[in-house]
Each structure stands twice: as C-alpha cells, then as structure tokens.
Amino acid sequence: MLPSTIQTLTLFLTSGGVLLSLYVSASLSYLLYSDILLKFSSTKRTAPTMSLDCANVSNVQAVNRSATKEMTFLLPEPEWTYPRLSCQGSTFQKALLISPHRFGETRGNSAPLIIREPFVACGPKECRHFALTHYAAQPGGYYNGTRKDRNKLRHLISVKLGKIPTVENSIFHMAAWSGSACHDGREWTYVGVDGPDSNALIKIKYGEAYTDTYHSYANNILRTQESACNCIGGDCYLMITDGSASGISKCRFLKIREGRIIKEIFPTGRVEHTEECTCGFASNKTIECACRDNSYTAKRPFVKLNVETDTAEIRLMCTETYLDTPRPDDGSITGPCESNGDKGLGGIKGGFVHQRMASKIGRWYSRTMSKTERMGMELYVKYDGDPWTDSDALAPSGVMVSMKEPGWYSFGFEIKDKKCDVPCIGIEMVHDGGKETWHSAATAIYCLMGSGQLLWDTVTGVDMAL
C-alpha cells in the first residue's frame, strides 16, 4: 500500500507526440534550526539536446532530435552563519594532535611542510588547519632561514583538520608571512600579509578570487591576528595592527563582506599596543578579543566590538592572573586595572574561546606554565563577570602541555555541530632548532566535551636529533 504522503507529479513533455509520465515520491519533514529561515532561489536549467535513435521502438510516432525544454527548479542557497549556544560540557579534553615531523623521514610529496603560526577556522561543513609555511619540507635542503618571521617565500596554506600538512595535502592560498581566514557560511575568506616591513600589504581572497587589498598605515610591519577572523550574517571582522614591536602599535578592525572591505573600525580606549588578537563571539551582538601587548604590560588588552554599531573599545584585563609571557607573579601588579606593572616587554599570542550558555557565559584562556619561557600550557576559565573590571583570579582547569614540552602561540576556534557550537583551544608546539636547522611546529587541540577533569597533556613525540 502506498503511503498517504506520496504525491504524484505527471510531467508531459510533448515533442512530436512523445508522452512521458514521471512519478515522484516525496516525504515531508520539518527542521527547526536556530531561528534561521532557509532561503530559496529560482534557478533555470535547460535540458540538454540529445540525439535519439528510436528504431524498432514501439509507441513512438515521431521524434524531434533537437528539442530542448526549460525547467525551473528551486535550489537552497547556503545560509550566512551566526553564533549559536555552545554544546553541553563542563571541561576540555585532548581532542587531536597534529605532529607532522613524526613523519620526517618521508620524502617527496609526502614530506611534512615546515610551518609556524598554525590556527584552525571552521565552516558549516568542515574545519581547516591553517599555517604559514617557509615553502620548504623536512627532510630537505632549505632549512636555512626557517626561523625568520618574514621573507619572500612564506605562504598561507591549509589542510582539512585531521590531515597532516604535507606537500601533497596542502593548499597554497597566497604568499604571506602573516595570516587569517574565516568562513561566512557560504564561502571562505583568506587573508595574507606580505611585503617589506616598511610597506606591507594585506591581501584578501574570497573563494578562488583575489578581491581586495589594504595598505600599511604606520609603515612598521602591518600584520594580522594569526587566528580565525569572525563572521556573522555575511560580515567578517578582522583585526590588524601596524607599529613597533617595542612601542606604539595601534590596531584596527576591517569589516569584510564577500571578500571586500566595506568599513574600517578604529578602537577607542587603551590603544597603545594591541596585536595578535584571538577573537570570538560573546553573543550575536559582541565580539571579544584577548590580545597581546608586546611593549608595556603582561596583562592582555581585551577588546569589545559591537557588531550592531561597528564600534570597538580596548581596556586591559583586570584579573590578577596575568596571561602573557614573560610576566610577573600573579597579583603583584598594584593600582587600578589599567596599571601596566613590570615585565611588559615581549609577549606571546594567547588562546581564548567562549562557552555560550542560556544563563551564563564562560571565557576560557590558555597561558604558558613557565613565567619566562615558552614552555608548557595551562587552561583557565572564568564564568560571567566583566574582564575589564573583575580582578578575581581565573580558575585553573588543567594542564594541556607540561613544562617539559614547548608551548608557543595558542588560539581559539569553534566547531559547528548540527545544533550547537563546540569551543576549542589549539596550541602551537614549536620544534626550535635554532638557526642551524629546521624550525617548525606541531598543533595540539583541546575541546569542550563531557564533564570531570582534563585528564592528559600532549607531547609532540619528535626528537630533532633523529
């Protein structure tokens, strides 16, 4: 017996007496998805011209061999992405290790690329693991110079998250010694910076097309955030900065839509030095960023950007848990929240990600276990409160990388589940071979899942002497 939900569609195609009947079965289903309405576009398709050999075929009187018919189909358009509530969980666990140089004896196209500054960005269907390569592999004969931050060979590359960034796996997006990327729900936006220190250039690529540029405004190493930009409703927000590594470096935000810059945002507040921000959505209205001050303080500059008004303000985090490296003892900086304290010269990019819940918000941070060296990485959390005014200590939540292992840059990102977003933090674990040999990185990833305590730290398993 046929179900009552079966509909019969009879399509008559008449071409010299040809009659075809098509029966299409359709079941009805309904999907409630985050209050976002699925949009449809009307797209015309033309049936291809076919040459039909109808010899010895009964019930056919005549055939027009060049007949074409126009049909209109309704095809769904991909939706812009919006931040959603985080998936349930109360702790982070080790999710993934990408340690390319465990395969360092492999040669040819399967050889691992020499990389640094890795980060992850996610679209609705996949996450991609990005990095900046020196256009060299290990093993190989081009190790010299792979410890340098900027040169003419560096490129922004990516692989699907979980793949090893080898020569054959990697997509080379553009020449760049600083980079970012994000997905607006329909397409990838890629950002790369290169050029001379005194006149660097930001380049933007949307899908496969190179779409826009932005020139240096302080003529002192224009650079971007080395982590994912953030998109909402088709608008993507990118942090950039330009200025001295040991002095003034004022940041800006670029509002980008379909690969083209549509607005510049100039933050107010404590703007002396802000770089390498790790940003995410606190809500549908606000992007928050934990950044690096390489000149004046071990506190993190904290940005709040209102996406409704396109305004941004920066203040220092007030917590007595100082997140930069090097840093003084926790709680040792006296005075108001805007006090710089000592040991402010130098710094490191820090991990930061939001846990959005119906009744509260969690802010997760990472910092090195060492106060002076890029060694180890620990996870911290603070629920609710205001990072600008809350002086309480952050709660330690587990060791992701022990003091025996390298912990360099860290970053945040969110994986798109069917109905919620999974917050994650990634850690760059650098194999520092000095100037004489290769200099590259592994990536450790921890994500919110389940309850209990963070159970295990990560090791790279790489011996550079082998």
UniProtKB/Swiss-Prot annotation:
Glycans are attached at residues 56, 64, 144, 284. Its cofactor is Ca(2+). Keywords: Calcium, Disulfide bond, Glycoprotein, Glycosidase, Host cell membrane, Host membrane, Hydrolase, Membrane, Metal-binding, Signal-anchor, Transmembrane, Transmembrane helix, Virion. N-glycosylated. Its EC number is 3.2.1.18. Coiled coil: none annotated. Inhibited by the neuraminidase inhibitors zanamivir (Relenza) and oseltamivir (Tamiflu). These drugs interfere with the release of progeny virus from infected cells and are effective against all influenza strains. Resistance to neuraminidase inhibitors is quite rare. This is Neuraminidase. It is a single-pass type II membrane protein. It comes from the Viruses. It holds the Pfam family Neur. Disulfide bonds join 87-420, 122-127, 182-229, 231-236, 277-291, 279-289, 318-337, 424-447. Residues 32-466 are virion surface. Catalyzes the removal of terminal sialic acid residues from viral and cellular glycoconjugates. Cleaves off the terminal sialic acids on the glycosylated HA during virus budding to facilitate virus release. Additionally helps virus spread through the circulation by further removing sialic acids from the cell surface. These cleavages prevent self-aggregation and ensure the efficient spread of the progeny virus from cell to cell. Otherwise, infection would be limited to one round of replication. Residues 38-86 are annotated as: Hypervariable stalk region. Residues 89-466 are annotated as: Head of neuraminidase. The active site is at residues 149, 409. Belongs to the glycosyl hydrolase 34 family. InterPro entries: Glyco_hydro_34 (IPR001860), Sialidase_Influenza_A/B (IPR033654), Sialidase_sf (IPR036278). The chain crosses the membrane at residues 9-31. Ca(2+) binds at residues 293, 324. It comes from Influenza B virus (strain B/Hong Kong/8/1973).
